[in-house]
Design a protein with these regions (language model features):
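Mature N-terminal, pre-catalytic/accessory segment of carbohydrate-active enzymes
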Residues: 19-41
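Phosphate/pyrophosphate-binding betaalpha-module
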Residues: 204-213, 227, 240, 244-259
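Metal-dependent enolase-superfamily TIM-barrel catalytic cores that perform enediolate-based chemistry
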Residues: 197-200, 204
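Mature N-terminal segment immediately following signal peptide/propeptide cleavage
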Residues: 34-66, 71
Length: 260
């Protein structure tokens, strides 16, 4: 059964990938640092930076991937004037994101971190890319190995367009039907199942070479406020938080995952 499911998913993905790959311009490779030299390279870069440049490295600038002169001017200013450490592309066309990534990397003295908010893959933000089910559907899968393979496939697609960090997976436990913003973004209402899915998917991302970021700490599943518009409050005692909201995040920490 597992083999049949994987075959079905693979066929769907291949069909979609062939379509979007034909539209995608080549990615400008900046080079890959040798693992043993990474720390020395980072120390050397930091030693040559001004205070302004060091501060800029802490910021990720949001860009809409549209090939416009205004967008290019925006990227130019973010990199040359404010010395940002990375970019977050959100929405638009796949080909535009790749072209703007190449443009941005060509401007940067220090290679940029290119980030993405793709909880269920590239299609969450980019048109014409492979579509996967929402997390609520994936939370019903009993074989967590499939979630791991799914994470690796999302990582592969991210790397093809130069993305190194994916702000996923959602580790919130959806236990409030009045929640206006989480819902199907969550793997479900069982903390243990959510934790298992989060760890499997995030491990797949990271084994595929893309940093995962579990969110939204300390838990956004039992709120009735959209945090994009106001500040949610969790009015629960520590025992409740440990057993539900914090449980998936603790499991992610135990698993040694890279981001939160």
């Amino acid at each position: 059964m597992k083999r049949n499911v994987l075959l079905f998913i693979s066929l769907c993905v291949v069909g979609c990938v062939m379509t979007y790959a034909q539209q995608m311009p080549g990615l400008l490779q900046k080079g890959k640092a040798d693992t043993q030299d990474c720390k020395a390279w980072v120390d050397e870069q930091l030693s040559e930076m001004s205070l302004k440049e060091k501060i800029g490295q802490l910021f990720i600038h949001t860009v809409t991937p549209l090939q416009t002169q205004r967008n290019k001017n925006n990227i130019y200013a973010a990199i040359k004037e404010y010395k940002v450490g990375g970019l977050l592309f959100s929405g638009g066309q796949l080909s535009d994101q790749v072209l703007l990534t190449n443009y941005a990397q060509s401007l940067a003295e220090v290679p940029l971190l290119i980030t993405f908010d793709g909880e269920w893959g590239l299609a969450m933000r980019l048109k014409g890319t492979p579509r996967f089910p929402r997390n609520r559907v994936l939370g019903c899968i009993q074989d967590n190995e499939l979630l791991y393979e799914y994470g690796k496939e999302v990582a592969r697609q991210c790397k093809e367009i130069g993305v190194q960090i994916n702000f996923a997976p959602v580790a919130d436990v959806d236990v409030n039907p009045r929640n206006p913003v989480i819902n199907t973004r969550s793997f479900g209402g069982d903390p243990r199942n959510v934790a298992q899915k989060v760890v499997a998917y995030a491990r797949g991302l990271e084994d595929g070479g893309v940093l995962s970021v579990c969110k939204h700490f300390p838990g956004h599943g039992d709120t009735e406020v959209d945090s994009h518009k106001a500040l949610p409050v969790l009015n629960f005692d520590r025992a409740r938080l440990d057993s539900i909201e914090l449980f998936p995040f603790k499991e992610a920490v135990k698993a040694g995952l890279g981001g939160m």
